[in-house]
Swiss-Prot record:
<keyword id="KW-0028">Amino-acid biosynthesis</keyword>
<keyword id="KW-0963">Cytoplasm</keyword>
<comment type="function">
    <text>Catalyzes the transfer of a phosphate group to glutamate to form L-glutamate 5-phosphate.</text>
</comment>
<dbReference type="InterPro" id="IPR019797">
    <property type="entry name" value="Glutamate_5-kinase_CS"/>
</dbReference>
<dbReference type="InterPro" id="IPR005715">
    <property type="entry name" value="Glu_5kinase/COase_Synthase"/>
</dbReference>
<feature type="binding site">
    <location>
        <position position="51"/>
    </location>
    <ligand>
        <name>substrate</name>
    </ligand>
</feature>
<dbReference type="InterPro" id="IPR002478">
    <property type="entry name" value="PUA"/>
</dbReference>
<dbReference type="GO" id="GO:0004349">
    <property type="term" value="F:glutamate 5-kinase activity"/>
</dbReference>
<dbReference type="GO" id="GO:0003723">
    <property type="term" value="F:RNA binding"/>
</dbReference>
<dbReference type="InterPro" id="IPR041739">
    <property type="entry name" value="G5K_ProB"/>
</dbReference>
<keyword id="KW-0547">Nucleotide-binding</keyword>
<keyword id="KW-0641">Proline biosynthesis</keyword>
<feature type="binding site">
    <location>
        <position position="138"/>
    </location>
    <ligand>
        <name>substrate</name>
    </ligand>
</feature>
<keyword id="KW-0067">ATP-binding</keyword>
<feature type="domain" description="PUA">
    <location>
        <begin position="277"/>
        <end position="355"/>
    </location>
</feature>
<comment type="similarity">
    <text>Belongs to the glutamate 5-kinase family.</text>
</comment>
<dbReference type="InterPro" id="IPR036974">
    <property type="entry name" value="PUA_sf"/>
</dbReference>
Length: 369
């Protein structure tokens, strides 16, 4: 066992928890718990991001069909979440380990203060030797405040926790060169250094019957987590000792290597926190200044602004081809930027009648993608 203490986020998809059936596979769940407890005994910290609330609710109520409406999904999630946490509490209790439930929505991560509060709560659970059991609060979350899937939620939890590893367990053995269910020649991709369009096309977008995540969402999660300095592994939840093997650096699934320079706390929030409300198009000179020189974004380099965001809102920064360059917190609203785009910094006051400084987005508030 690796003796260096690590923080590991283990994301368990619905297909892993149900074994492809319509109810929780508690026999397999206890085996996953055993491995998590083994890591804890070795000095590691473990966080479980669990799916399965709707499946658990459907099982408990003997619900006759798959839920189609938001109301029915939330009803099943409300009933199922209590069943799910009871199952985890019972299984970890076999080994004398306490668990604590955290239910999150996008809104908890969008607001900086709530983000920090969630981070503090997560750290408090870990410091008190309690295993956090995290899920999205599906019973109350609307489309506007949903993270959307537990793959991306697990990446955000990894950022909150300052995790070393994120393990995405699924019903597939990792990322393949093609869909292994359709192409017998598909080969497992064992290691990924860069996530590009080729990989995104390979990942596709299929999910499972009761789940919301497919390989495409796992790739999104891996991209976010690795930019925050977290190693990500996609592996089969049914593989023997998959959790303990990954921590011991034994080959399992597909490994995504983290970027060399991990982001500081505030920039991690920019990456993980609020969704972008608009886009800022910048010219070639500004792209070079931001990417190569690490400069702040000036209004002079902006050619177009779309969407609507307020001062302090997060915006996407793209080049003239529409390619994503960065995300950043704007010091001016979208309306203001539309008026001062292409203008020199010294002209901002003359145009607006006020100013919030010479830069549109300061380099400390900007994360390269």
């Amino acid at each position: 066992m690796n003796t260096q203490s690590q923080t590991i986020v283990v994301k368990l998809g619905t297909s892993v928890l149900t074994g492809g059936t319509l109810k929780l596979d508690r026999a397999h769940m206890v085996e996953l718990v055993r491995q998590c407890v083994q890591l804890k005994k070795a000095g590691h910290q473990v966080i479980v991001v669990t799916s399965g609330a709707i499946a658990a609710g459907r099982e408990h109520l003997n619900y006759p069909e798959l839920p189609k409406t938001m109301a029915n999904k939330q009803l099943l999630a409300a009933v199922g979440q209590s069943c799910l946490i009871q199952a985890w509490q019972s299984l970890f209790g076999i080994y004398g380990v306490d668990v604590g439930q955290m239910l999150l929505t996008r809104a908890d991560l969008d607001d900086r203060e709530r983000y920090l509060n969630a981070r503090d709560m997560l750290q408090a659970l870990l410091k008190n030797n309690i295993v956090p059991i995290v899920n999205e609060n599906d019973a109350v979350a609307t489309n506007e405040i949903k993270v959307g899937d537990n793959d991306n939620l697990s990446a955000l939890v990894g950022i909150l926790a300052g995790a070393d590893k994120l393990l995405l367990l699924t019903d597939q053995s990792g990322l393949f060169t093609a869909d292994p269910r359709k192409d017998p020649k598909a080969e497992l991709i064992k290691e990924v250094h860069t996530i590009d369009e080729t990989l995104r096309k390979i990942a596709g977008g299929s999910g499972t019957t009761l789940g919301t995540g497919g390989m495409a969402t796992k790739l999104q999660a891996a991209d976010v987590a690795r930019r925050a300095g977290i190693e990500v592994i996609i592996a089969a939840g049914s593989a023997e000792n998959v959790i303990t093997d990954v921590v011991n650096s034994k080959p399992q699934g597909t490994k995504f290597l983290p970027v060399e320079c991990a982001l500081e706390s505030r920039k991690r929030w920019i990456l993980a926190g609020p969704p972008s409300k608009g886009s800022i198009v910048i010219d070639e000179g500004a792209v070079n200044a931001v990417q190569q020189k690490g400069s702040s974004l000036l209004s002079k380099g902006i050619t177009e602004v779309s969407g609507h965001f307020v001062r302090g809102g997060v915006a996407k920064i793209v080049n003239t081809k529409g390619e994503l360059i960065a995300r950043g917190i704007s010091r001016y609203s979208s309306d203001d930027l539309s008026k001062i785009l292409g203008k020199h910094s010294q002209d901002i006051y003359a145009v607006l009648g006020y100013e919030y400084g010479p830069v549109a987005i300061h380099r400390d508030d900007l994360v390269l993608i």
